[in-house]
Regions:
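Acidic donor-binding loop at a coil-to-helix junction in glycosyltransferase catalytic cores
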Residues: 112-113
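Short, well-structured N-terminal submotif of metal-dependent ribonuclease cores
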Residues: 1-42, 47-65, 157
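Short, hinge-like loop/turn segments at secondary-structure boundaries
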Residues: 51-54, 94-95, 145-149
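Residues that scaffold the ATP/ADP-binding catalytic core of kinase and kinase-like folds
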Residues: 11-12, 46, 87-90, 139
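Alpha-helix capping/helix-boundary segments
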Residues: 8, 39, 83, 117, ...
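Short active-site oxyanion
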Residues: 31-33, 73-75, 122-127
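Acidic catalytic patch
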Residues: 70-106
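Acidic, PIN/NYN-like endoribonuclease modules and their adjacent C-terminal/linker elements
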Residues: 118-161
Length: 161
C-alpha cells in the first residue's frame, strides 16, 4: 500500500496533473492507495489561509476537497494509537525537531505533518508516496519507512521492506 502525502494529493486538483502521477495511480490502482487525516488537515488549512485574500479560490478548493472525500478515493487513514505513540517518539527526537519548531518569523510554520504522515504510514506498513523525498529521508534515518517513492520522478528512495 502507498500513503500519498499532501503534495501528491494536491496534484489531483490541477487542471493538468503531473504527467507521471495519473498513469502511476492507474497502474497501482486505488485499492493500494490511501492518504491520511493529516493531509486532509493540511488541505483544509490551505483553504482557510486562502479564504482571507482569495475567497473564490478557497471556495473552489473546498468544493474539490469535499468531492474527493465523498468519492472515497483515496481512502483516508486515521491517526491510530500506535501511530500517535510513534509520533510522540518522533517529536522527542532532537534531529527531527525542525519539523515541529520553526522561527516565528518564517513564512511557513512547521506543522509536524510529515512526521505524522510517516508515523501513520509506518504503523500501516505502507510506503510513503511524496514529491518531497528530502523530508521523509530525514525521518527515515531515525524511523525506517516501509518504503519511499516519488511518483513524479518515478523513483524509489527507500525500497519496500
Amino acid at each position: 500500500m502507498f500513503v500519498l502525502d499532501t503534495k501528491v494529493v494536491s496534484t489531483f486538483r490541477k487542471a493538468t496533473p503531473h504527467p507521471a502521477v495519473t498513469p502511476w495511480i492507474a497502474q497501482t490502482g486505488w485499492q493500494a492507495i490511501a492518504t491520511t487525516v493529516i493531509t486532509i488537515i493540511e488541505l483544509q488549512r490551505g483553504v482557510e489561509r486562502a479564504r482571507v485574500q482569495h475567497p473564490y479560490v478557497a471556495d473552489n478548493v473546498e468544493r474539490w476537497l469535499t468531492g474527493l472525500l465523498a468519492a472515497g478515493t483515496p481512502q483516508v487513514l486515521p491517526m491510530g494509537v500506535m501511530a500517535a505513540r510513534l509520533l510522540g517518539r518522533m517529536h522527542e527526537t532532537p534531529a527531527l525537531r525542525h519539523f515541529i519548531l520553526t522561527d516565528p518569523q518564517a513564512k511557513e510554520q512547521a506543522t509536524g505533518a510529515d512526521l505524522a504522515i510517516a508515523a501513520i504510514a509506518i504503523t500501516a506498513g505502507a510506503a510513503v508516496a511524496t514529491g518531497n523525498a528530502k523530508h521523509f529521508l530525514q525521518i527515515n534515518a531515525w524511523f525506517p519507512l516501509p518504503g519511499l517513492f516519488d511518483p513524479m520522478a518515478q523513483a524509489w528512495h527507500v525500497t519496500v521492506v
